[in-house]
Curated annotation (Swiss-Prot):
The lineage of its organism: Bacteria, Bacillati, Bacillota, Bacilli, Bacillales. The keyword Cell inner membrane does not apply. This is DNA mismatch repair protein MutS. PROSITE patterns: DNA_MISMATCH_REPAIR_2 (PS00486). Belongs to the DNA mismatch repair MutS family. InterPro entries: DNA_mismatch_repair_MutS, DNA_mismatch_repair_MutS-lik_N, DNA_mismatch_repair_MutS/MSH, DNA_mismatch_repair_MutS_C, DNA_mismatch_repair_MutS_clamp, DNA_mismatch_repair_MutS_core, DNA_mismatch_repair_MutS_N, DNA_mismatch_repair_MutS_sf. ATP binds at residues 607-614. The gene is mutS.
Amino acid sequence: MTEYTPMIKQYLEIKDKYQDAFLFFRLGDFYEMFFEDALNASQILEITLTGREGGTKEKIPMCGVPYHSASGYIDTLIEKGYKVAICEQVEDPKTTKGMVKREVVQLISPGTVMDERGLKAKENNYIASLYCYEGKEYGFAYSDLSTGELKSTVIEASEDRLINELTTLSTRELIVSESEKTVLSDVMKEQLGLTFSVHEEDTIPSENEKLVTRHMSLSEKRAIGKLLHYLKETQKRDLGHLQQAVHYETSNYMKMDYYSKRNLELAESIRGKGRQGTLLWLLDNTQTAMGGRMLKQWIDRPLIDRKKIIERQNDVSELMANFFERLELVENLKNVYDLERLAGRVAYGNVNARDLIQLRNSLYQIPRIRATLLSMNSKSLTELANQLDPCEQLTEKLEEAIMDSAPISIREGGIIKDGYNSQLDTYRDASRNGKTWIAELERKERELTGIKTMKVGFNRVFGYYIEVTRANTHLLPEGRYERKQTLTNAERYITPELKEKEKLILDAEEKSMELEYLLFTEVREMVKDYIERLQKLAKSVSEIDCLQSFADISEKNHFIRPTLSEDGSLHVKQGRHPVVEKVMGAQSYVANDCDLDENREILLITGPNMSGKSTYMRQVALTAICAQVGCFVPAEEATLPIFDQIFTRIGAADDLIAGQSTFMVEMLEARNAIVHATKDSLILFDEIGRGTATYDGMALAQAIIEYIHENVHAKTLFSTHYHELTDLEKELRGLQNIHVSAVEENGKVVFLHKIKEGPADKSYGIHVAELAELPKSLIERASRILEQLENENKKIIITNEKQPEEIHEEVQLSMFPVEPEKKTSSKETKLIKEIASMNIMQMTPMDAMNKLYELQSKIH
């Protein structure tokens, strides 16, 4: 590095400590980037790439952004998953000889964003950490730095379990050790799309020991320690707003894996990846940002505690019964700002006067919200009201100190009210009187000189001045006016009196601003003492906001309060898919019943494509989720069990990850459900077996149904195109056939979307193809093939359209000529028997791959 200039050497020394981040290196009014950072940033940020002399023969690549507008560029990099290290000058260049000292003052990463512009109001921004204990369990901790939330748990050392937690939280960043990162599969890293940060230290920092409770396990403490150490090293400031770590058990909530949540579109649409068209979109009428975040948490983790579900239902009932009070509550909530993130910014030291005005205005609403809740004479709502802490002394202090019109800048005055501090009032009087004197001076000088256009002005460079147009300078008396600045068409002067008054005014203004900043920081420090109380208040307000949202949505959409069954039975009368109904309109939607109990555990659903089988299945699951988050449900009547888990395999929107086929994904998801489901679970399987050959698929579908019926006993909705499976109703006591009805009118199919008992009598597949506007000749050809295949129930392989060859044995249908059947060798017979004896449903994916390799070697 000897050939580089001192400044470039300094840059490289700092960059060496932050290899995985873009280093924003402060040079004057710019943040500069060099070398590879410059090459990459210029492309990502679409800024000009230049070069700088640095002691080498060739110029060093360089690009930069103005420091006053750097936030937007930082946000862009963070949104794309990068990290940014902010390197500032920590010495005054005017008083420093030689190289100015520079240090990284903060590392900003996807999981540590604090700037409002980089955060979504109704979404948490989670950073998580992992500690693997002897390969048996994961200590798992996560935090939202912007709100101070900190939680932890212990989960099974399984990638599936880890993925479920990370996706439930929409985690932006995961902290792991180098060894842990190596263990995690590339497939997982690619699938999650989050930022991985390597950090080894995992002991609890001494100043944060109070955040951890004694009963936590070693792996949990290590995960928390790793997270806290990483935040301490990267943020380099007080993190006093971090709350005490709350231990949670995943078993206390309904479990749904990533694919089930995606298939049901709980918080993210499959199509647009946004909220539009999701259950969260429908249920969200929260008035506060923090209420919106809590609502998403509720939907991501439905309750399984009967008492807590009923408590929420009671609150929603009371709010629905008090319409006018609820309207008043909504108006009050609209004026409550994001108390959680305000508290975070206070702790971070980057809160401004307008933030404190928002805090004060929010606190004004708390007594009103409390009074409204108490007026409803509800025991449950009274308990919520009594949790509201109005922080009266803080409200009074903010009212007394901060101006309503305070600017964003905290160093230019205009923040503190008159009368708050006597010394500040003295400085202000001096400044105001001086300005009054100057205004009077302008009038007097005009009279004295007769120059009507003369004016007294001020700028930061030259201070106060008297400006006279060049045409009138001869009217000025000699010896009294001292020239200060020459302009194109005017001259600027100063007089001895103005010079004296300028010093008094500017001294007063400077002292006034210094004192105002000091007083503001004192108020800010006082607010810090209230952080914990504000965080508790924010939680209570958020809960009230979520409950009023449920009440509002339930009323507007004609939802009813469900009953929770004791015997595991499910009875829904005229149930609706809440989101589809909202999109289509209530008049267009066809409601349906659903009944499941110990004698009717499996519903086998048949019917044509596009008839509504998948929608019906989803609506049952969404009804259960609505009930277990404490909301009312879209039905005329509903009795529902408390499901411990929901498993879904719905639709064809498969992620073909890691080169897996649709069928492999299908089987993996089926295995996940069958292995983990209990009698208290809900399983939704849509067209299982469609991804493989006809008879393979049918055989697997039947075996899966039988296995669930005999071993799992979960409530199951199973849709299929294999009409042969409807005969299972005769063999399996707990299986019932239902179908989605359709009729033909004038040769066209009409979907009625109505669920009826019994199997479908026809598939209408060709009619659906016709609706899709396939070529007419193709439709006609398909109709002829269908007619031939249905003839006498014989399976036919078409070798020539005019001379069909009848085949009476069961074979897979083909549209092409087939080779004559060859005699099976003894070696092949052994392989077939070995394959037939394999227990596929009990195999892990790795076992299956090893077995496949073994069989392949026997063939060769």
